[in-house]
Amino acid sequence: MGRSLKKGPFVAASLLRKIDKLNDKGDKQVVKTWSRASTILPQMVGHTIAVHNGRQHVPVFVSEQMVGHKLGEFAPTRTFRSHSKSDKKARK
């Protein structure tokens, strides 16, 4: 079930404030955030946002195709280590 259109997209207030300040200055600094649930808005395009993945902040450069998606989609939380080869010695 999606979010009500009446409410609008969720964006952390602190993140939105930081992005608006950078847009007013015309500055392009990396913005650090822990808010993975925030929706990417059109005013965020062109900025680099460092999204926390539970261990570190992953830099995400926001492009036009990302608008409407969540920040957490672009910062993977799990690292996949390949499956071990079927080795007879390793099993014993």
Curated annotation (Swiss-Prot):
InterPro entries: Ribosomal_uS19 (IPR002222), Ribosomal_uS19_bac-type (IPR005732), Ribosomal_uS19_CS (IPR020934), Ribosomal_uS19_SF (IPR023575)
Gene Ontology CC terms, in alphabetical order: cytoplasm; small ribosomal subunit
A GO BP annotation: ribosomal small subunit assembly
Pfam families membership: Ribosomal_S19
GO molecular function: rRNA binding; structural constituent of ribosome
Family per record: Belongs to the universal ribosomal protein uS19 family.
HAMAP family membership: Ribosomal_uS19
Protein name as it appears in the record: Small ribosomal subunit protein uS19
Organism expressing this protein natively: Synechocystis sp. (strain ATCC 27184 / PCC 6803 / Kazusa)
